């Protein structure tokens, strides 16, 4: 028979869309592939523009999950995906990362569908971070865990995962950046915003632990104003709705040199990072992107889940400490760019064939999971 395997992929946030973009194209090519969007943040700025920028088809299914509360969203994700699992009956189920969307895997587990989890094994060891709980749950219910690094693989093995079900694939982000290199280099976003290369700071902050408390959002306002005052340069802030809401609610006052902007598309945001004097972010992707593209960056978190990035010191971690941020920016000012780089790329972030690996792994392990775990 020439029947194609049925694979279902679930996503719901920008990082998932970006990282999965090249994988999705391969899954569309080789399998009967269903792409499900949980509806978490599906609007033009947060999601739709990324599908356009990355050349992806519109999702086949929208769960239209409410985001009124995290627990309500999680409940809806699990209950709504169940309907489509029963209808489509996929042979395999793929998720990436640690967002609430990944918890759709709980429904797949109940249906005894083989679960493949990309970006498995990441740990920040900070229980205040909501994603830490998510990633532990998804790792431990997944059948095949696909890690970016040996460190992540070792974490899973130390937690009792069977070695034959943990596979290091490397990060998919380098392949995505390479696929869109021409578009990134041709971006006109600096001209559009009247910015000069290496003469502005780029900031992106959205994590719950950073922006949801009054104390921290006030700190963020103070550090933005301090950077603007010290260097007399524009500070461009890519404004996530969560951050915008907190700034408004807490009446944070910002200097005129602080430029608040709605979230950028993938192409323009990468171009802004490359051409910034430095990028300050609490994003999970900052370690990888700064390592691959060699732009100066600070990670504004107190804990992170990518220690392999620190082995090459690709990014410095400062939290929201103004004194550490200022010292960090001073160090970054001497960072060599382009071919003269002295901060070397992290090997685990440099793979350009992850999208080829994933379909092969899925094809190889569906029967293995069914026979060895579910005794089908």
Residue ranges, per PLM feature:
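Active-site and donor-binding regions of nucleotide-sugar-utilizing enzymes
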Residues: 8-11, 16-26, 30, 50, ...
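N-terminal glycine-rich anion-binding loop in soluble enzyme alpha/beta folds
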Residues: 29-59
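Donor-nucleotide binding loops and adjacent catalytic segments primarily
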Residues: 40-43, 48, 185-275
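A nucleotide-sugar donor-handling region in carbohydrate enzymes
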Residues: 40-45, 64, 141-216, 318
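Short alpha-helical donor nucleotide-sugar binding micro-motif in glycosyltransferases
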Residues: 81, 85, 271-276
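A donor-sugar binding/catalytic signature common to diverse glycosyltransferases
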Residues: 95-96, 102, 117-118, 145, ...
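C-terminal amphipathic helix plus adjacent low-complexity
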Residues: 336-376
């Amino acid at each position: 028979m020439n029947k194609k395997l049925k694979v279902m992929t679930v996503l719901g946030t920008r990082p998932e869309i970006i990282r999965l973009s090249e994988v999705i194209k391969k899954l569309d090519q080789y399998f009967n592939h269903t792409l499900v969007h949980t509806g978490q943040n599906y609007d033009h700025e947060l999601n739709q523009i990324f599908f356009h920028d990355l050349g992806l088809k519109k999702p086949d299914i929208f769960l239209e999950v409410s985001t009124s509360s995290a627990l309500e969203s999680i409940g809806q994700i699990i209950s709504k995906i169940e309907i489509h699992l029963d209808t489509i009956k996929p042979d395999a189920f793929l998720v990436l990362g640690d967002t609430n969307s990944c918890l759709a895997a709980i429904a797949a587990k109940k249906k005894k569908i083989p679960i493949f989890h990309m970006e498995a094994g990441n740990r920040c060891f900070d229980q205040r971070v909501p994603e830490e709980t998510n990633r532990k749950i998804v790792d431990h219910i997944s059948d095949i865990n696909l890690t970016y690094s040996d460190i992540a693989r070792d974490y899973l093995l130390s937690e009792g995962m069977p070695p034959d079900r943990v596979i290091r694939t490397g990060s998919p982000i380098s392949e995505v950046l390479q696929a869109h290199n021409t578009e990134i280099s041709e971006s006109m976003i600096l001209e559009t915003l009247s910015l000069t290369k290496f003469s502005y700071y780029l900031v992106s902050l959205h994590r719950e632990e950073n922006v949801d408390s009054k104390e921290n959002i006030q700190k963020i306002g103070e550090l933005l104003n301090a950077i603007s005052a010290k260097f007399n340069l524009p500070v461009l802030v890519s404004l996530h709705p969560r951050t915008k809401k907190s700034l408004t609610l807490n009446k944070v006052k910002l200097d005129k040199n602080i430029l608040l902007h709605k979230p950028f598309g993938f192409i323009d945001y990468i171009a802004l990072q490359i051409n910034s004097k430095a990028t300050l972010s609490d994003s999970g992707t900052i370690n990888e992107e700064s390592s691959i593209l060699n732009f100066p960056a600070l990670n504004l978190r107190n804990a992170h889940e990518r220690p392999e990035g620190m082995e090459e010191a690709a990014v410095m971690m400062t939290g929201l400490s103004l004194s550490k941020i200022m010292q960090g920016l001073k160090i970054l000012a001497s960072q060599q760019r382009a071919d003269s780089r002295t901060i070397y790329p992290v090997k685990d972030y440099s793979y350009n064939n992850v999208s080829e690996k994933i379909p092969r792994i899925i094809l190889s392990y569906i029967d293995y999971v069914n026979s060895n775990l579910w005794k089908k």
